Regions:
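A phosphate-binding catalytic loop at a beta-strand-loop-alpha-helix junction
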Residues: 88-99
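Cys-dependent protein tyrosine phosphatase-like superfamily
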Residues: 1-89, 103-127
Length: 127
């Protein structure tokens, strides 16, 4: 089972979540799930969107590859995360993409330029 890591009061990250974890995050008051996984990845939770929405959570699958994170793409992701009901769980297969996206989101929100934040994410080995 993957660990859900709370980053701040608005955002948490995880690898692929299980049905039990999905129920747990709903019980803990999460409002939305952002899935970064690609449709062709292995180990996906079957019917994740349907199961998430049945629990009353907002769900978005924004298929994101780490090597394709760029300024334009991150701008779109930033706007999406900003609009999602909070708290939000952001997950991928092993939480590395999730960590990179959340790091970039927080850095941009704090006024750090995208390029500087991206270099830090790269130096941390997240992408």
């Amino acid at each position: 089972m993957n660990i859900v890591r709370k980053i701040n009061d608005e955002l948490s990250i995880a690898g692929q979540i299980t049905l039990n974890q999905l129920q747990q995050i709903a019980d803990e008051g999460y409002k939305s799930v952002l899935n970064l996984r690609l449709a062709n990845e292995t180990g996906l939770l079957a019917n994740e969107q349907e199961k998430t929405e049945l629990l009353g959570l907002y769900y978005v699958n924004l298929q994101t590859q780490a090597e394709n994170i760029n300024h334009q793409g991150m701008s779109e992701i930033y706007q999406l995360i900003t609009k999602l009901p909070k708290p939000t769980l952001i997950h991928c297969d092993n939480s590395i993409r999730s960590a990179a996206i959340v790091f970039l989101y927080i850095a941009i929100k704090q006024g750090i330029g995208f390029e500087k934040a991206l270099q830090k994410v790269i130096s941390l080995g997240l992408i």
